[in-house]
Amino acid sequence: MEELPIACTLGAADMADRRDAWEALLRDAALERERLPHGARVRLRDAPGIAERARALIAAEGACCAFLAFDLGADDGALRLDVTGPDDARPIIDGLLTL
């Protein structure tokens, strides 16, 4: 399998807006965060609108950061968001999820 380059295609202004959207989601819904071997996991409150906001951000990230993989699921009454990528992407994942 070919490894994708670790590069984001967003410009500076769009990157700031995206960062703000992630920070707002995490501020509104994050219950706990943990590191995974190749990424991180965030448990989110399963409240109205949270899954939709997370899905929208996942879709947007997929368009600009193809080297990251996202998995959103349910786990013990909460949402579980896993973000994984190559080892060199760890600082990006940590920054995205403010670990």
What spans do the regions from the language model cover?
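Amphipathic, hydrophobic secondary-structure cores in small proteins
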Residues: R55-G73
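Secretory/periplasmic and organellar redox-cofactor proteins
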Residues: M1-E52, D71-L99
